[in-house]
Amino acid sequence: MQLKRYISIFLTLLLLLGASRASAQLDASALMRGQRNSARGGNTLGGMQNGYGSNPYDTGVEGENGEGQPGEQQDSTKKEKKPRKPLESYFFSDSIRALRNFQWTVDRNTNKIKIAPIDTTLALWRLDYPHQHKRLGNNSVGGLGQASQEVNYFERNTSREFTFARPYEAYAYSLENVPFYNMKHPYIWMTYLESGQKRYREEHFEITASQNINPSTSFSVNYKARGAKGKYDRSRIKNQNTAVNFAQTGKRYSIHAAFLHNLIDQQESGGVVGEWAIADTVFEMPSGVPMRLASAEANNLYRNTSFFVKQSIGIPLQRMTEHDFSMADLSAVYIGHLFEYNSWSKVYTDKYATYTDERYERNENGTFKSHTDTYYKEWLLNPETTRDSLAERIITNRLFVQAQPWDRNGVVGTIDGGIGLDLHTYSQFALTDYLTGKYERVKKTAWFAYAGIDGKIRKYVDWGASFKLYPSGYRGGDFDLRAHASFTAFISGKPFTLSGEFSQSATSAGYWMDNWLSNHYMWQNNFGKENETRFNVAFTVPDHGIELGFWQSVVTDKIYYGADCKPAQHGGAVSLTSIYAQKDFNIKGLHLNHRVLVQMSSNNEVVPVPLVSAFLSYYYEFWVKRDVLRVQIGLDGRYNTSYYAQGYNPALSVFYNQREVQVGNYPYVDAFVSAKWKRMRILLKYQHLNKGLFGNGEAFQIARYPLNPGMFKIGISWAFYD
């Protein structure tokens, strides 16, 4: 039998030397079958399609045009080209490896990744604002690149880190969202959109370049520049984001590393002096609308530099043989480490100035009475100008272990555990700095431990749980407990999934909620922990465009920013409920997509939410030329009921609760034509189509911050694979 095996392998190698150039995608299962057949002596002269000869990275050429030359004598001096080693990482399943290109993001705590498709379709192309991509998207203070907050309360970030930069997280790169790529060929993707006249123009430019050095090693560069000169006074913004990353996903060892840089330069308008300036259309040009900080020359400059390296190595608990393509199906232990450096800074400047509201109130004769005021009521450090700077830095080290008892997709797939140490540094002006001549730096150390377990029962059940605890020291007593499960049934080959999640947490106030000193605000607080219990249930049928969701939360001792823009803690419990429904109809190319969210808060003075929010998209999609040019023509509309929406404070960079003006009952409609011509996407869009046509004219999502008026947009996106 051994002799027969060696003869079979020898014949296999001879056939490889004369094989034609391989072009099929790598199928790990087929490769393993080929190895087993070879080991059993089962390969025949004509059966090499299951062996290494189908390696898609073997690009050797034997003939003049790449064809094999059967019957011709081979050059005995020609050096044999060694087949390139295929992608063997346990992170990727056979179906993922078979993709031409794919991307993923890494998990901060565990040895896991999240696969995501590369978006080159028309699905979200017409939504040119990144903060609009998820379900109903975010409420924004204006247009492209500006501060925003999620419509759905349950989708908002609850982290206490870098809270002053949170309004821009839909645009900024971070460890959680930086993409890593695996490409069969070098990949370049460029996007450019612009709108409006030159003096008011919005511009959106992106470029991504990625290349695999070998099947397991990739390098990529991402650069995004989103900004606007602004339709309204003092609304110019530059939002630039850069990510340079490297990934090696080998059979046992993996490393992910990235350098990230975010720069945001935002002029601050402070919002309109009164809603009448937008609703009554008394100004011919948006640039003439009076803003509360127009004369104050207010400005925010944010800078972020981040760098991380995440590594892990696998130790198989079973002997690996030539039949084992990856470690995913073996008992194994993985040991890993994460190092992260993350630093954000903010500089806010302004000067003393007043604004005048010409329609502040009516007198006894019914005529309008004007009122002159200042945006900020306090000038604590300098009565004429402001330059408030602050910075926050975190250096993180995490050591984690992952056990794989049987296989990665087993009933008990992975058991995770880890410990971490966060070194926090905060700096802001303090009164003692008058004596030292430099900003004081406050350093705090937080350490924590965490654990988790995940498993699957084939493709029908997915479950897991996790727990994180800060035992003592800074943030001592904080914890986060989570559990989830999903059940999938297949009817006519289509998945129907019911899923649920439960979480309970106790969270300390962020540093900036307890400590603040600037020209306009000062506080020293000692808040207690915020406690929250959540659960949600969802039912999805992707093939029929159906998603139903239900969220419930009870929050006690909620910490929020009140009407005076200062932090406050509610002494009781607040109950929040959200119900989400999505149904996409497709009638012979006519798409009628509906997303509706109902939210209820037991105390809208603590957690204000609109009762109903909706996003409707109606368009017709068709082929102009089959497999060459596909086109969408339609309308997008957004709406929410009236409520006391949050305001936005530029000096603090936070959203705060207010009870002065209501926002809502205004539809915001866009008309678009989008197309995909081979690898190119094209967009023609008129934003805010209904401006001045219908609606109450109050085009606001955040109190006193008007949305952009009507403007025409044109854009192009092109992918290159070579």
Question: Which residues are covered by each model-predicted region?
Answer:
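Short hydrophobic transmembrane-like helices used for membrane targeting/insertion
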Residues: 7-9, 61
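Membrane-proximal, glycine/serine-rich, low-complexity loop/turn segments characteristic
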Residues: 25-305, 315-328, 490, 494-495, ...
